[in-house]
């Protein structure tokens, strides 16, 4: 979860995601990094207006935003090998109710670290920042993100090319897309002249 992968995510969100109804973000086997807040800027940006360009449909101009944004449904996949920033991301998606999380609880290895070289002895890493859940105050260290849908792979499934967690994520995403597409839309009311109303 570094800036190179973040910029690739932002680019592919529209190059690959264009016209799609939802996306699955897979942070399984992800060792972490530092891009959760950048990802959340894309995925949780509040909407304050609807725009309609001449001859076009409803939307909002992407060039007005810090990053391209995604408001359609998402599902996050995580597992026991999701660490650090991948866990913070999974916790955030669940806490903010931005999407559903599928997989197994993450490792519970959430702590910012730094380090120093030790003369003739290598490198010593030291924790310097703890991470706590908003609302409950629970320490994310030793408390992994718990998915909405817990599903452990059975022995032999992954080597055989069967990914039951991904299948579950697809099933959940389809339900979320259906709910999203059926949500009420505000009626757009065109401006009327105040002079006409006074007559």
Language-model features: locations:
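Cleft-lining beta-strand/loop regions that shape enzyme active-site pockets
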Residues: 1-122, 157-165, 171-179
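A short pocket-lining beta-strand/turn micro-motif at the edge of beta-sheets
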Residues: 97, 120-124, 136, 145-147
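Residues in well-ordered beta-strands of folded domains
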Residues: 102, 127, 150-152
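A sequence-level detector of short, solvent-exposed, charge-rich linear segments
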Residues: 58-62, 112, 120, 145, ...
């Amino acid at each position: 979860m570094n800036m190179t992968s973040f910029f690739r995510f932002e680019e592919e969100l529209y190059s690959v995601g264009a016209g799609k109804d939802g996306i699955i973000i897979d942070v399984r086997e992800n060792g972490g990094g530092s891009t959760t807040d950048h990802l959340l800027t894309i995925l949780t940006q509040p909407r304050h207006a609807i725009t309609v360009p001449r001859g076009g449909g409803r939307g909002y101009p992407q060039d007005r935003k810090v990053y391209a944004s995604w408001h359609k449904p998402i599902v996050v996949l995580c597992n026991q090998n999701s660490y650090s920033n991948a866990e913070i991301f999974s916790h955030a998606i669940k806490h903010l109710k931005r999407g559903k999380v599928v997989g197994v609880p993450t490792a519970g290895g959430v702590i910012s670290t730094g380090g120093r070289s030790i003369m003739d002895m290598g490198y010593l890493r030291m924790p310097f920042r703890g991470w706590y859940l908003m609302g409950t105050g629970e320490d994310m260290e030793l408390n992994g993100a718990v998915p909405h849908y817990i599903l452990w792979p059975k022995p032999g499934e992954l080597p055989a090319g069967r990914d039951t967690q991904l299948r579950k994520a697809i099933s959940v995403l389809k339900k979320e897309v259906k709910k999203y597409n059926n949500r009420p839309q505000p009626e757009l009311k065109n401006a009327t002249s105040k002079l006409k109303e006074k007559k």
